[in-house]
Swiss-Prot record:
The gene is gpsA. It catalyses: sn-glycerol 3-phosphate + NAD(+) = dihydroxyacetone phosphate + NADH + H(+); sn-glycerol 3-phosphate + NADP(+) = dihydroxyacetone phosphate + NADPH + H(+). NADPH binds at residues 15-16, 36, 110, 143, 259, 283, 285. It is found in: Cytoplasm. Belongs to the NAD-dependent glycerol-3-phosphate dehydrogenase family. This is Glycerol-3-phosphate dehydrogenase [NAD(P)+]. It comes from Shigella flexneri serotype 5b (strain 8401). The keyword Nucleotide-binding applies. Keywords: Cytoplasm, Lipid biosynthesis, Lipid metabolism, NAD, NADP, Nucleotide-binding, Oxidoreductase, Phospholipid biosynthesis, Phospholipid metabolism.
């Protein structure tokens, strides 16, 4: 590989970043995968697989490991950031002075900025300026299934149509990975944050033992909360019926590969928040997302009762069963109402 002709540099060598890098390389593209821990990258290079997260999925020959950030960012104009949302801004500020003049940035991070609840597009603009093309990919994607080449579909939105077209061509694989373009940059970002919150609630419901009826009701009303918040932010309501909305929501709420769902199940079974996080052993994005989504909802005056009750459990010590009963005991309403 020539030092400057990779199709993509992926920032973040966790399970999802590695899975996306594998997918790109499997499509025949030269891909550079960077991680912050040189020892981890050396292990990946030695094993030619990510044994910790994605065992038995060998790296294609066109996937190149890199621990030097300068070299990684020089390799491609296209940068795919796949890091937890609470370090997203920090990572962008770190890479900005090292990026090529023609750089374009896409992220697969799902969530909002820690503490402020800002959309990641606002974090990116603040860190990188107004000129760089931005894009986001989001949808129902478990890393293990994606890396294994099982059929998967996502949504892609960008501030730049040329960048969107290029990304769709790079990522799309007719055999296993379908990429839908979507002009709704706000909606595609927001769905990935709110679904994490609702997935914790779905897990709580199942952990309590409320059954499939309750889980489905919670998913449906969670989608309504997502759509209301999206409308307040200027998103297209139709986006939330697509991959980045309903698709990701159903996946995360119903399958135990979801850390957010498993976390919620433990809470529903009576485990405390700290112990549940420790037992998961990886980042539970929904824990922070709950606080961030609640902040955003308050800022825009959007009522989100499910989000509020999950917040009460996570941050105020409320019992999960009590929170569920609070939701069930709310006043009768028209299903189509805005609250």
């Amino acid at each position: 590989m020539n030092q400057r002709n990779a199709s993509m540099t992926v920032i973040g060598a966790g399970s999802y970043g590695t899975a996306l890098a594998i997918t790109l390389a499997r499509n025949g593209h030269e891909v550079v995968l960077w991680g912050h821990d040189p020892e981890h990258i050396a292990t990946l290079e030695r094993d030619r697989c990510n044994a910790a997260f994605l065992p038995d999925v060998p790296f294609p020959d066109t996937l190149h490991l890199e621990s030097d950030l300068v070299t990684a960012l020089a390799a491609s104009r296209n940068i795919l950031v796949v890091v937890p949302s609470h370090v997203f801004g920090e990572v962008l500020r770190q890479i900005k002075p090292l990026m090529r003049p023609d750089a374009r940035l896409v992220w697969a991070t799902k969530g909002l900025e820690a503490e402020t609840g800002r959309l990641l597009q606002d974090v990116a603009r603040e860190a990188l300026g107004d000129q760089i093309p931005l894009a986001v990919i989001s949808g129902p994607t478990f890393a293990k299934e994606l890396a294994a080449g099982l059929p998967t579909a996502i949504s892609l939105a960008s501030t730049d149509q040329t960048f969107a077209d290029d990304l769709q061509q790079l990522l799309h694989c007719g055999k296993s990975f379908r990429v839908y373009s979507n002009p709704d940059f706000i909606g595609v970002q927001l769905g990935g944050a709110v679904k994490n919150v609702i997935a914790i609630g779905a897990g709580m419901s199942d952990g309590i033992g409320f059954g499939a009826n309750a889980r489905t009701a919670l998913i449906t009303r969670g989608l309504a909360e997502m759509s209301r918040l999206g409308a307040a932010l200027g998103a297209d309501p139709a986006t939330f019926m697509g991959m980045a909305g309903l698709g990701d929501l159903v996946l995360t709420c119903t399958d135990n590969q979801s850390r957010n769902r498993r976390f919620g199940m433990m809470l529903g079974q009576g485990m405390d928040v700290q112990s549940a996080q420790e037992k998961i052993g990886q980042v539970v994005e929904g824990y922070r997302n709950t606080k961030e989504v609640r902040e955003l909802a308050h800022r825009f005056g959007v009522e989100m009762p499910i989000t509020e009750e999950i917040y009460q459990v996570l941050y105020c010590g409320k019992n999960a069963r009590e929170a569920a009963l609070t939701l069930l005991g709310r006043a009768r309403k028209d299903e189509r109402s805005s609250h």
